Swiss-Prot record:
InterPro entries: Amidohydro-rel, Metal-dep_hydrolase_composite, Metal_Hydrolase, MTA/SAH_deaminase. One of its GO terms (molecular function) is metal ion binding. Zn(2+) binds at residues 66, 68, 230, 319. The keyword Signal does not apply. It holds the Pfam family Amidohydro_1. GO terms for cellular component: cytosol; nucleus. It comes from Schizosaccharomyces pombe (strain 972 / ATCC 24843) (Fission yeast). Belongs to the metallo-dependent hydrolases superfamily. ATZ/TRZ family. Keywords: Hydrolase, Metal-binding, Zinc. This is Uncharacterized protein C1F8.04c.
Length: 463
């Protein structure tokens, strides 16, 4: 297929933008076979089928570095609540009552939303055993998305230093969770033509003993298994590290967690020493920046400006539906740019170009994937198109990169191609029956809430 007449943000090493550009993906190929001006490619490949993307902005598929697949069924169930109440009274109670069918439907729902809003690759943070990892893998394979599924690794049920706070009994796992993660890796890693990866989803500091951390790291490094972990998300995390006579990054460094294919989510409460350790000893460690979640839960604002100044690899993640409400990474990208401008009183910092890099090429670096994140010959054919050509709110359309970050939302995504296959065409998801999924999500969400005995009410009276 020859995708023609697009304006292409390549994110290649010279950051070229091709006006009236085209991308060739040959029949049966999963890589970009050629890219350039439309006139040239049409003349060279006269027998290829054409799909016109005239007026569309084409860019690499978005990479979301921090996602909770199961939490889509918890959407809007815990808004405007303090963190501990949010966790104990709603989120953990509902997740602790999941069935494996809930896990499959929730995975489908999260993935469908990501696909329709331009995310082509994601990292799942901590998929619990009770959710049924087979269902998550099935959802990834069926949908066409790329997914790094972090199977939860834990042996402590508490939250940071909150000794009186424990997870719902339905979510508690022991050190055998590491063995289960290894088994899942052996069984599922590489499925779906390589689109499925199984990672270790270390819960949080405080949720994993030092002994289990060290075992996990040893196995991960020996087998090139990715690790993702919530880290320094809330002030209580900082208190936990202090109780161990550590800062967040001295703790991670001591345990051997820092290194390639380690994605640390949130990283809000860091000090100068932490940033210097990441800069000098990170060895490819990356950060999943989640500004919407951190804002909605009152966790704080991550030191994004400082991390980028030290060339730390920072990508972007949407987190989960109870703390974000959508999986629209384009909205997350806008927030990621705006927050540091307001915090530092400087509108020039973290510009649109840097944000696009975070959502594409930086995400690829975080995953250890040199075949993703930019549009170049030989790289995976993962790209999206946004149609702003006839939108009132986008006119007059000038700077394309700026438009992606400050104007576009997931609703503007018209085309999604992953692994060379057309997944979304003219805003229609081709791999999942949307009406059927919506119906299933409503039913499963209702039954789950009833089973968990969670009462969700707004503050205003419904009559």
């Amino acid at each position: 297929m020859l995708y023609t007449h697009a304006n292409i943000i390549t994110v290649n090493p010279t950051r070229d933008i091709l006006i009236d550009g085209a991308i060739l993906v040959k029949d049966g190929s999963n890589t970009i076979d050629d890219i350039g001006k439309t006139d040239r490619l049409v003349s060279i490949y006269p027998n290829e089928k054409h799909k016109s993307l005239e007026g569309h902005i084409v860019m690499p598929g978005l990479i979301s570095l921090h996602v909770h697949l199961a939490q889509s069924l918890l959407r809007s169930a815990a808004d405007d609540l303090p963190l501990i109440s949010w966790l104990c009274d709603t989120v953990w109670k509902m997740q602790g009552n999941f069935t494996q069918e809930d896990g499959y439907v929730a995975s489908q729902l999260t993935i469908a939303e990501m696909l329709k809003s331009g995310t082509t690759t994601f990292v799942e943070a901590l998929f619990a055993q009770r959710y049924g990892i087979e269902g998550a893998v099935k959802a990834v394979i069926e949908s066409g998305i790329r997914g790094c599924i972090g199977k939860v690794v834990m042996d402590q049920p508490r939250y940071a230093t909150q000794t009186g706070v424990s997870m719902h009994e339905g979510l508690i796992e022991n050190s055998n969770s590491l063995n289960q993660a290894v088994e899942s890796h052996s069984k599922f890693h590489g499925k779906g033509n390589g689109r499925v990866e199984i990672w270790f989803g270390a819960r949080t500091p405080g949720g994993v003993s030092e002994e289990l951390y060290r075992k996990m790291v040893k196995i991960a490094r020996a087998n090139n298994i990715g690790i993702t972990m919530h880290c320094a998300e809330v002030k209580a995390d900082r208190e936990f590290f202090a109780s161990k006579e550590h800062t967040p990054m001295t703790y991670c460094k001591d345990l051997g967690l820092l290194g390639p294919k380690t994605v640390l989510a949130h990283m809000v409460h860091l000090d100068t020493q932490d940033l210097e350790i990441l800069e000098k000893h990170g060895n490819g460690t990356s950060v999943a920046h989640c500004p919407v979640s951190n804002s909605k839960l009152g966790s704080g604002i991550a030191p994004l400006k400082e991390m980028l100044e030290k060339s730390i690899i920072v990508g972007i993640g949407c987190d989960g539906c109870p703390c974000n409400n959508t999986m629209d990474l384009l909205q997350e990208m806008k927030m990621a740019s705006l927050l540091p401008k307001a915090l530092h009183g400087d509108p020039s910092i973290v510009p649109a170009e840097k944000i696009v890099e975070m959502a594409t090429i930086n995400g690829a670096k975080a995953l250890g994937r040199d075949d993703l994140g930019s549009l170049e010959v030989g790289k995976k054919a993962d790209f999206i198109s946004l149609d702003l050509s006839n939108k009132l709110y986008a006119q007059p359309l000038r700077d394309l990169v700026s438009a992606v970050v400050y104007i576009a939302t997931g609703a503007d995504v018209a085309t999604v191609v992953i692994d060379g296959k057309l997944i979304v065409e003219d805003h229609v998801l081709l791999t999942i029956d949307e009406p059927k999924l919506i119906d299933k999500a409503k039913k499963h969400g209702k039954k789950l809430q009833e089973r968990a005995k969670v009462d969700v009410k707004g503050r205003w009276k419904e009559i």
